[in-house]
């Protein structure tokens, strides 16, 4: 193993994932990005940023615990950035169970894998303004209470609090 930091980015083909991969590559990281098996992933953002050839793309599915564990075990990343999600609010109303399984339980699967493989792996969980939902004060800040109004918002709020719980419980 080299001293190069390794990062795993779920959702690397999205806007945030693409720009994060570019930043980490510029900082000298070895970057792994995930794509769902069988999905017709669009790599246009990664191509536009001229980083696709420098990213190790891995088949990955937040629904499959064993796949998550094997991926983390084989890469042994120093950092994991969980940007993947079923993020379309209207779809979350049509498919609330799938949305929750991907966003909420998918996060738990990653957290539990980190706990069993290497508790020193740093973990970032992406959030969304949808977690605030119905707000009384604008703008929101760290004191604004969550009041999600969609299955998507609820699932991301669950992921947020699960991340806090794991950090506080398994420090």
Where are these regions (language model features)?
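N-terminal Rossmann-like NAD(P)+-binding domain of SDR-like oxidoreductases, especially those catalyzing
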Residues: 1-171
């Amino acid at each position: 193993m080299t001293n190069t930091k390794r990062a795993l980015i779920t959702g690397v083909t999205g806007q945030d994932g693409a720009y994060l991969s570019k930043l980490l590559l510029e900082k000298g990281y070895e970057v792994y990005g995930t794509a769902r098996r069988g999905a017709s992933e669009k790599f246009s953002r990664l191509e536009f940023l001229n980083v696709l050839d420098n990213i190790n793309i891995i088949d990955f599915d937040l629904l499959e615990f064993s796949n998550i564990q094997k991926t983390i075990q084989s890469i042994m990343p120093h950092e994991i950035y969980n940007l993947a999600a079923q993020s379309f609010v209207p779809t979350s109303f049509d498919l609330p169970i799938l949305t929750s399984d991907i966003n909420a339980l998918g996060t738990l699967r990653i957290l539990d894998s980190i706990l069993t493989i290497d508790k020193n792996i740093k973990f970032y969980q992406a959030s969304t303004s949808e977690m605030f939902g119905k707000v009384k004060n604008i703008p929101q800040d760290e004191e604004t209470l969550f009041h999600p109004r969609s299955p998507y918002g609820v699932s991301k709020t669950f992921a947020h609090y699960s991340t806090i719980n794991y950090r506080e419980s398994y420090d």
